[in-house]
């Protein structure tokens, strides 16, 4: 496996994950948080919420293509169920074509930050709360109001929402995978919200939570009648 460094200082590999959380992933997470906080006004807690998902989707490899496939493959399957980039945009046109149309290089972290910003400002909407609010409220019977917009989410603070609520909101409102009803996914990502918050804020590195390889299936409770799918970005739910 060759680990290289791009012109922006981020480590990447064209054929492998970086490790969860390897020194490479931690390095990239800190740089990415700096971009999002300083250039776009995110909070460290908002970054941590999104990073909890990136831990499983790409392990902070900006050039990650699902299945360790090549860019040529992604371009040949531009409308298919192939995840690309930090958050595994699916289909690939969501990041590759979007970048090409603007004269940008999708492989750069700065480009992927611009894409997230376009989504955040509802220029290219990815964050939906309806009809997924119902599932959120069913999970949190106390009636806690979720972050209704991506701006609310990315500017969140620990005083507003718990790590579990941040994990659940991102899965339900942004990722929308087939396995969205499996609460164990929220609990899995909750640990990583806390982990990345400590990393970003400069606290001593905590012990990482349990590591799952990207694409590890998390089975829903037996007998619930729902499809058992990995927590991939499922195209019928992404727009």
Question: What annotation goes with each model-predicted range?
Answer:
Residues 44-61, 116, 169-171:
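Short, functionally critical alpha-helical segments immediately adjacent to catalytic or ligand/cofactor-binding
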């Amino acid at each position: 496996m060759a680990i290289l460094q791009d012109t922006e200082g981020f480590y990447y590999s064209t054929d492998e994950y970086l490790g969860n959380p390897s020194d490479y992933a931690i390095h990239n997470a800190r740089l990415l948080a700096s971009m999002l906080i300083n250039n776009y006004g995110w909070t460290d807690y908002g970054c941590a919420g999104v990073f909890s998902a990136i831990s499983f989707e790409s392990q902070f490899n900006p050039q990650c293509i699902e299945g360790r496939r090549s860019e040529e493959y992604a371009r040949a399957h531009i409308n298919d169920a192939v995840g690309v980039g930090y958050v595994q945009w699916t289909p690939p046109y969501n990041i590759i074509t979007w970048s090409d149309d603007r004269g940008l290089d999708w492989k750069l972290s700065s480009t992927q930050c611009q894409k997230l910003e376009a989504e955040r400002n509802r220029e290219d909407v990815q964050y939906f709360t309806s009809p997924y609010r119902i599932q959120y409220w069913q999970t949190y019977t106390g009636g806690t109001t979720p972050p209704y917009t991506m701006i609310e989410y990315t500017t969140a603070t620990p005083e507003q929402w718990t790590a579990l609520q941040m994990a659940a909101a991102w899965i339900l409102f942004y990722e929308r995978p087939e396995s969205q009803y499996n609460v164990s996914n929220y609990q899995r990502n909750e640990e990583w919200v806390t982990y990345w918050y400590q990393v970003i804020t400069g606290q001593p590195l905590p012990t990482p939570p349990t590591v799952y390889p990207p694409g590890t299936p998390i089975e829903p409770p037996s007998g619930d009648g729902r499809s058992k799918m990995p927590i991939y970005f499922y195209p019928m739910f992404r727009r």
